[in-house]
Amino acid sequence: MGRTVVVLGGGISGLAASYHLSRAPCPPKVVLVEGSERLGGWIRSVRGPNGAIFELGPRGIRPAGALGARTLLLVSELGLDSEVLPVRGDHPAAQNRFLYVGGALHALPTGLRGLLRPSPPFSKPLFWAGLRELTKPRGKEPDETVHSFAQRRLGPEVASLAMDSLCRGVFAGNSRELSIRSCFPSLFQAEQTHRSVLLGLLLGAGRTPQPDSALIRQALAERWSQWSLRGGLEMLPQALETHLTSRGVSVLRGQPVCGLSLQAEGRWKVSLRDSSLEADHVISAIPASVLSELLPAEAAPLARALSAITAVSVAVVNLQYQGAHLPVQGFGHLVPSSEDPGVLGIVYDSVAFPEQDGSPPGLRVTVMLGGSWLQTLEASGCVLSQELFQQRAQEAAAAQLGLKELPSHCLVHLHKNCIPQYTLGHWQKLESARQFLAAHRLPLTLAGASYEGVAVNDCIESGRQAAVSVLGTEPNG
């Protein structure tokens, strides 16, 4: 009888792990267990009354690098090439990004000319920050906060405006708490290897071999900055589910895991609400803190390391306006914490993907709310109503983009604990977990956003790596 692998969590990481397991030459029996009634995790697309697409989670995927190429290969393998909506390199959504500082939108400088001239909100040309960076000595600490790293290498303005905003946009987090080593490993490694971040990024870390396909070649030739799918990004997990079913993977929905226990013969017993499963190996693609509460007593040191990986909530407010126009064209803008503690940024969805505007077309923007404002609200225990978030989002759209009319359509979703926080020393938590798993030879593999990347590409790759680890070899078609 063959091995049984149980995958916990039907988000994109668990789906990717199941996909690669199912494509092995001699695949194990795969059981995917999801606590909710739907697959896809935070990737969710909703169609509005006029046919417009609203993304409640991620809204675009970057094609860059080996990870971006692997995701495009997955898209092709699933037969979704014709559904891809690219943002090409010459498009405003690829070229223009903004910061909202001092009550005004400021375009982030691009190209050499942009770096050589003063660009508000920065008081001096960013060229000088780059020059300063080249002369700075290498840091001596094994880890550092993003703010400390950026201030030391690039100066206080870049740290408090650009990097603060970036941490809010990517992690909905605080740059004074997040780890440079874990959140931006390429910057950390560039300094370690080349003493200078800029030098390291210019010289690169050596070419990583990446897959090849017609879609990957097209993305490179047209310099795509991101892409989506015609019916929304949820088409990707939906296609994965269809594929898994065709490959004989058992998909259990609405089955939250209640506990994990080790049997005498070294197999897992996975306890569900009304039943249980036996597994030779478990891949956990659920949040680290959730897994920590399911582990048996003999794995207490592992549970302690995992429970220390926390996550923050984000309120996503999708707004659509009829007959409205944006003051600028671009991907969107970020807001530093010094400007507004609650508004993380606004994405101009209609600029990047006008094909999803519906009929009649309406201007779509998404306001992200979070940060210390939301954390304080959550801690206070007061009711977090949809009206509260809608009002806050409409006020931000009015003040920051001049969208003063009432939206024709609005969706509000509070995603509780949706983005893991790689705080200072995160790498040590991962090391503790790895050492425990290796020392005790536990048939458990960790995957998902809690560990080494929160972007969709990172999650898909973590699922693939988990499958490779279980199979002991690269799966093939």
Swiss-Prot record:
Write down how the cofactor binds this protein: Binds 1 FAD per subunit.
Q: Which GO terms describe its cellular component?
A: mitochondrial inner membrane; mitochondrial membrane
Q: Which UniProt keywords apply?
A: FAD, Flavoprotein, Heme biosynthesis, Membrane, Mitochondrion, Mitochondrion inner membrane, Oxidoreductase, Porphyrin biosynthesis
Task: Name the InterPro entries on file.
Answer: Amino_oxidase, FAD/NAD-bd_sf, Protoporphyrinogen_oxidase, Zeta_carotene_desat/Oxidored
Instruction: Report the enzyme's class at the first EC level.
Output: oxidoreductase
Q: Which cofactor does it need?
A: FAD
Q: What is its main location?
A: mitochondrion
Q: Which compartments is it annotated to reside in?
A: Mitochondrion inner membrane
User: Which EC numbers characterise this protein's activity in its record?
Assistant: 1.3.3.4
Q: What's a Gene Ontology MF term here? A: oxygen-dependent protoporphyrinogen oxidase activity
| Function in brief | Catalyzes the 6-electron oxidation of protoporphyrinogen-IX to form protoporphyrin-IX.
Indicate what this protein is called per its UniProt record: Protoporphyrinogen oxidase
